[in-house]
């Protein structure tokens, strides 16, 4: 598709879709809680729909009523062996978390994904789940999908130190631990997003968080809840950056989730000189509205414990850095290489093809700015965040056109992205 270029100031108010991470976990925990769970504000992107369909195939009744998702949970014992392969589409979250959940079930399943997901390593969940007594395997020593899993009603608790910073691996182990008899401990390398821990407790589960160590004594039963999903800060990030780098822009981003394990991007842009104001902050619900205006920015260093708190925002932060004065250095972000694409290489290649000055490193990027950006022919490469980054980049292009292939990938997390973009350009 041909993208909008040479945009004037962006003006208006935006309500971003529901948080993808929280939406997944609401469905997963609701499916094994006892009673009727109702979810408001659920993201209806393709990844979450993959999770919903997986649980329907596992015998859980899930339907939409009055703009809410209603899940009829029967507890951990209520799941039934699927009659077909579970297709997780493009969703690594679905595959890894559901594998953890099915670890304690007395049946076997085969889990597959699309071409992109089939290139993402699952060894990170295979090894701890095997330690708990699950028969699980993928392709090659990296355990690429498809995964074959035989659950075990007599799971063993483990103490596991994560070799990488991964909320998905942590979550897979905790979901299995809810069904294991005894004390499971997960020790993180760096603190990652804690939605699973928070939602287990919201559903009546018990665990202890002590710094980087999470302790859970199983088995436990969960109780159905009413869940309201806040706006996804990872989706809001695209408008946040657009507002900061397009001259004359002023945007109000409504109802954005600001769980502290996800707010790294806000800290980074403020350090770079961004003018942002928080309105209607609700600290208990961890939700706020964010007013952003065009700002003059300077380069910075992004590394260490900050990385897990903004890992999904790094592509759009890279674009931001191309418009900042000086050098921005992103380090310790090697996890980007095993996302939907090798995001370090793809971001570098796309932005450099449009005139940026970026050097890819083994674990990040070195970005020099500010640079003028030009038109190019490019692709999402099947990665939703790459697609949205490119669409925001195109707004800065004053010379040439920008053509984007495989734009349908954006449906993964933000089905109304282009509609919202057009509205902000016209308000």
UniProtKB/Swiss-Prot annotation:
Localization per record: Cytoplasm
Pathway(s) the chain acts in: Metabolic intermediate biosynthesis; chorismate biosynthesis; chorismate from D-erythrose 4-phosphate and phosphoenolpyruvate: step 6/7
Annotated binding of phosphoenolpyruvate, by residue: 20, 92, 120, 168, 343, 385
UniProt GO MF annotations: 3-phosphoshikimate 1-carboxyvinyltransferase activity
SUPFAM superfamilies: EPT/RTPC-like (SSF55205)
Catalytic residues in the record: 312 (proton acceptor)
Keywords: Amino-acid biosynthesis, Aromatic amino acid biosynthesis, Cytoplasm, Transferase
EC number per UniProt: 2.5.1.19
Enzymatic reactions: 3-phosphoshikimate + phosphoenolpyruvate = 5-O-(1-carboxyvinyl)-3-phosphoshikimate + phosphate
Binding residues annotated for 3-phosphoshikimate, in chain numbering: 20-21, 25, 166, 168, 312, 339
Pfam annotation, one family: EPSP_synthase
Main location: cytoplasm
GO biological process: amino acid biosynthetic process; aromatic amino acid family biosynthetic process; chorismate biosynthetic process
SUBUNIT field: Monomer.
NCBIfam families: aroA
Membership in a protein family: Belongs to the EPSP synthase family.
UniProt-recorded name of the protein: 3-phosphoshikimate 1-carboxyvinyltransferase
Species the sequence originates in: Streptococcus pyogenes serotype M18 (strain MGAS8232)
């Amino acid at each position: 598709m041909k993208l909008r270029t040479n945009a004037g100031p962006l003006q208006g108010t935006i309500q971003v879709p529901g948080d993808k991470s929280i939406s997944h976990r609401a469905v997963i925990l609701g499916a094994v809680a006892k009673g009727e769970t109702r979810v408001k504000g659920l993201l209806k992107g393709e990844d979450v729909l993959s999770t919903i369909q997986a649980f329907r195939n596992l015998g859980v009744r899930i339907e939409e009523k009055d703009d809410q998702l209603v899940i009829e949970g029967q507890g951990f014992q209520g799941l039934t062996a699927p009659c077909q392969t579970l297709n997780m589409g493009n969703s690594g979250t679905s595959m890894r978390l559901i594998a953890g959940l099915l670890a304690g079930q007395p049946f076997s399943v085969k889990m597959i994904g699309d071409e992109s997901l089939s290139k993402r390593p699952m060894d990170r969940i295979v090894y701890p789940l095997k330690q708990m007594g699950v028969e699980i395997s993928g392709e090659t020593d990296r355990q690429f999908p498809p995964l074959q899993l035989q659950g075990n009603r007599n799971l063993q608790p483990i103490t596991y130190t994560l070799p990488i910073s991964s909320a998905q691996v942590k979550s897979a182990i905790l979901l299995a631990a809810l069904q294991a008899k005894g004390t499971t401990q997960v020790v993180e390398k760096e603190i990652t997003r804690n939605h699973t821990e928070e939602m287990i407790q919201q559903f009546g589960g018990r665990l202890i968080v002590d710094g980087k160590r999470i302790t859970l004594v199983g088995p436990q039963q969960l109780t159905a809840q009413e869940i309201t999903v806040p706006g996804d800060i990872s989706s809001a990030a695209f408008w946040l950056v657009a507002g900061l780098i397009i001259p004359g822009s002023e945007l109000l981003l409504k109802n954005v989730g600001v769980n502290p394990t996800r707010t790294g991007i806000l800290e980074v842009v403020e350090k770079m000189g961004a003018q942002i104001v928080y309105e209607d902050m609700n600290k208990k619900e961890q939700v706020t509205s964010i007013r952003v205006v065009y700002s003059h920015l300077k380069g910075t260093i992004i590394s260490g414990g900050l990385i897990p708190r903004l890992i999904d925002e790094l592509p759009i932060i890279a674009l931001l850095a191309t418009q900042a004065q000086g050098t921005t250095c992103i380090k310790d972000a090697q996890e980007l290489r095993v996302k939907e694409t090798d995001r370090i290489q793809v971001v570098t290649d796309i932005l450099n093809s449009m005139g940026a000055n970026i050097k890819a490193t083994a674990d990040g990027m070195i970005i020099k700015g500010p640079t003028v950006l030009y038109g190019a022919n490019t692709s999402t490469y099947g990665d939703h965040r790459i697609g949205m980054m490119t669409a925001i980049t195109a707004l800065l292009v004053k010379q040439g056109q920008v053509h984007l292939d495989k734009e349908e990938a954006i449906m993964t997390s933000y089905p109304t992205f282009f509609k919202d973009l057009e509205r902000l350009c016209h308000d």
